[in-house]
């Protein structure tokens, strides 16, 4: 489990306003990050589009970050800020 910075009140409110799927992806990343999009899909059993949208929503409110996977630069790994 990765150590993350505490969430600001503004980030908490923004997260609360997101769809349940984005909150679910956030929780998965909270406990199992870093993960690729494919690994998140496998963990959550959500569709690829739903996970993609959830990751976009989480990036918009600036609570997750990503970088290319070292072994496959076509994929990104996602983790909490």
Model-derived segments and spans:
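Linker/hinge segments immediately adjacent to helix-turn-helix/homeobox DNA-binding domains
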Residues: 1-11
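Short, cationic-aromatic polyanion-contact patches
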Residues: 9-22, 36, 67-81
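Hydrophobic residues on short alpha-helical segments
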Residues: 22-29
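Residues within the helices of the helix-turn-helix
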Residues: 27, 38, 56
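Short helix-capping/turn signature of helix-turn-helix
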Residues: 31-32, 46
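Glycine-centered, phosphate/nucleic-acid-interacting loop/turn motifs that mediate DNA/RNA or nucleotide
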Residues: 62
């Amino acid at each position: 489990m990765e150590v993350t910075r505490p969430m600001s009140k503004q980030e908490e409110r923004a997260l609360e306003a997101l769809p349940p799927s984005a909150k679910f992806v956030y929780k998965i990343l909270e406990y199992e990050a870093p993960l690729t999009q494919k690994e998140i899909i496998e963990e959550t059993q959500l569709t690829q589009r739903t996970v993609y949208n959830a990751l976009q929503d989480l990036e918009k409110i600036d609570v997750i970050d990503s970088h290319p996977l070292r072994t496959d630069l076509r994929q990104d790994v996602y983790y909490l800020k």
